[in-house]
Amino acid sequence: MTTPLPAKPARQTAAFTLIELLVAVALALIILFAASSLLISSSRSSSDLQVRNDLLQEQQIAQNYLIANLREAAYVYPQGTTLNLGSGVTTQRPGGGAWVVGSSTAPILAIVKAPELPVSGCSASNDRACYKFKAYYPVVRATWVSGVGAASQNNPGADPSNETSWLLVEYTKNLVQTTPPTITQLTDLAPVGLNGESGKLLLDYVQPAVTGLPPLFEVPAAGPQAAGQTRVTVNLSVSRAASGKIVAVPARASTDPATWVQPVLVAPRNVGRLTP
């Protein structure tokens, strides 16, 4: 008679309970959410940094160009001067009305730049020998974009988040004459003889005027001008709304608009040489 083999014990297999599965799923979701938040935050930080770098580079280029022209000025139109630059969209003053040097709400810098070559050779085909009237002023971004035409090289493109931002514009008119202008002639040109040209886009996303913000340009009062004594202050600040945040250059360490600029003081080297 054979002895039956002893029965093998039943093999137990490990299994997750419903509660354990729910806990595991919850932990996985938490980890996924944290990783997603980190990725989004990193992406936004990278985007903000790119916007800031772009603003900084464009501001520096425009500011250096403006300052280089200002240093060569033979005359700076003083506070209180009314300028007629025409009625086109590229010369449209924020808020309307006439351009007045010294305005804080719609600032304008107007100069006459000395020629690179002897003025005796000035002609329509040789403008390097001509004195040049130059003005720098803001135009509301939405006004400019809608008015210059989509195909224009001067059109930076629509940006609904920044429609009220300013563009900094350069306006140039050659003074075609073979002798240096007098101060009286330049003064007489201001209300009637400087229109007929179009402004060119110099810088995008310029900070509009707000209470407490230093004016974009601070120019001398009326009176004799002399090299080393006549000075102009440029208070250039740029800001852009991007991804729900304001990115500004210079960076804003305070909510006080008085701290939003880094003033640059410029002394034109050719003033005082023109006869009254």
Predicted regions and their residues:
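Aliphatic-rich helix starts adjacent to a transmembrane/signal segment
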Residues: T2-I67, R71, Y75
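Intrinsic low-complexity, intrinsically disordered segments enriched in polar/basic residues
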Residues: T2-T3, N64, G88, T178-T179, ...
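Intrinsically disordered regulatory regions flanking bHLH/HLH domains
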Residues: N53, V100-V101, A114
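Short, glycine/small-hydrophobic-rich surface segments
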Residues: E72-L109
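Intrinsically disordered, low-complexity regions enriched in Pro/Ser/Thr/Gly and acidic residues
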Residues: S104-A106, A110-V264, P268-P276
